[in-house]
Design a protein with these regions (language model features):
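Sec-dependent signal peptide recognition
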Residues: 1-8
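C-terminal motif of bacterial Sec signal peptides marking the signal peptidase cleavage site
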Residues: 13-14
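Auxiliary, metal-adjacent structural segments of Zn-dependent hydrolase domains
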Residues: 19-23, 37-138, 149, 174
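Non-catalytic terminal regions of proteins
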Residues: 24-52, 56-57, 69-71, 101-103, ...
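Short pre-active-site segment immediately N-terminal to the catalytic Zn-binding motif
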Residues: 139-156
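Active-site recognition of the HExxH zinc-binding catalytic motif
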Residues: 154-167
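Post-HExxH zinc-binding segment in Zn-dependent metallohydrolases
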Residues: 167-232, 240-266, 270-280
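Long, internal scaffold/assembly segments composed of regular secondary structure
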Residues: 226-333, 337
Length: 368
């Protein structure tokens, strides 16, 4: 998911130019796995809109080419959702198979799609009949599942949402994160900064969960105090705000969109990466530490802040779409003052095991 925003503009450009929906009778172009994939997409899209998770985003209305694969990854069938042109050889699915979506069976590009995706699960700007689509694979195991965390629909909603970033949203003034010549993350991971990062990861652990408006505002103030302190230590940390705006919003949408669809909700939390206090065992080099704490953690922290903004009654959709980062929005809704930094930073340290946090940060900072 590291590079998707850079390449998603073309895929959504002209997404309103799909061919008119044609009504057909009962069809037999799909199997149970396919039908479940379409049903999941429809339910998730409806959930995102109807629950006010993100009422300007309808995932099921975007141009998508889905490829079903077997358990070895070999492509078996392809389906164009919301085709942008009349594709020769494509067959329209009836409502008995499509869950009411505009879906066409088209196997003519399944191998090309799989080649473009390669060892990943998805790709942007895949060309079908001269038009650009988001493409993704799915299979029986990641479709016929009761897990809100491991189903393929979760990834689909996340990645398609990135098209909204590129096509509609105003980008924040903060800079994106650059990569070095080897494609690695360049992010400060001093012991002092790691302590503060782990502190807000502990603060957000277990979200989304029910909190009152006053609790949400209090947690947001602690977060703002921590991030403001990070920035005062190293202004480069401002780039985390952009990351929370881009990846955090997509993480929020994918998590909330699947929240009520599956019986098994374990791991369907914003901070689904391993607990930071055990990472000194699994992260072996400083490069790995920088990659995790300079990129991965902002998916969950951004989503957590947006969840708290929602609980505080703030119009986060409008703010994010106008280019405010979650950090900036949190400062607005809490009416945060710089004089409160030491107060809420101290509260966060007292509420969580600060000595344990310091020891974890020490171990991580000593990686070579």
């Amino acid at each position: 998911m590291k590079y998707q925003i850079l390449f998603s503009a073309l895929f959504l450009a002209g997404c309103g130019n799909s061919v008119p929906v044609e009504e057909v009778g009962e069809t037999f172009h799909a199997n149970t796995v396919d039908e479940t994939a379409f049903s999941n997409l429809k339910k998730t899209s409806d959930s995102i809109i109807n629950s006010d998770t993100w009422n300007t985003f309808n995932c099921a209305s975007k141009p998508i080419y889905l490829v079903r694969t077997d358990n070895k990854g070999n492509p078996e069938a392809g389906f164009v959702i919301n085709p942008k042109s009349r594709i020769s050889g494509a067959r329209k699915l009836g409502k008995n198979e499509s869950s009411g979506l505009n879906v066409w069976r088209y196997d003519g590009a399944i191998q090309l799609a799989k080649d473009k995706i390669g060892g990943n699960l998805y790709a942007f700007n895949f060309i079908v009949d001269g038009k650009s689509y988001y493409t993704q694979t799915y299979n029986e195991s990641n479709t016929m599942t009761n897990s809100a965390f491991s189903n393929s629909n979760k990834l689909l909603c996340h990645e398609v949402f990135h098209g909204l970033h590129q096509h509609k949203l105003i980008h924040p003034s903060y800079s994106k994160q650059p990569l070095d010549s080897n494609g690695n993350i360049v992010y400060p991971t001093t012991r002092q900064l790691l302590e503060l990062q782990i502190l807000y990861l502990d603060l957000f652990e277990g979200l989304p969960k029910s909190v009152t408006k006053s609790q949400a505002i209090d947690m947001l103030k602690q977060y703002v105090a921590i991030r403001s302190t990070e920035i005062s230590i190293d202004p480069y940390v401002r780039r985390a705000n952009y990351q929370e705006w881009s990846e955090g919003t997509a993480q929020f949408v994918e998590t909330m969109g699947n929240m009520h669809m599956f019986k098994d909700k374990s791991k369907n939390v914003f901070m689904y990466f391993p607990n930071p206090h055990g990472l000194h065992v699994t992260l072996h080099t400083q490069s790995q530490v920088a990659s995790h704490f300079g990129w991965n953690v902002f998916y969950g922290s951004g989503a957590s802040v947006i969840w708290l903004l929602k609980q505080a009654g703030f119009d986060y959709v409008k703010a994010i779409e106008e280019g405010k980062t979650p950090y900036e929005a949190a400062k607005v809704v809490t009416q945060f003052k710089d004089s409160e930094i030491s107060i809420y930073l101290g509260k966060a340290k007292r509420t969580h095991n600060w000595k344990r946090i310091q020891e974890t940060a020490r171990k991580l900072s000593e990686k070579k």
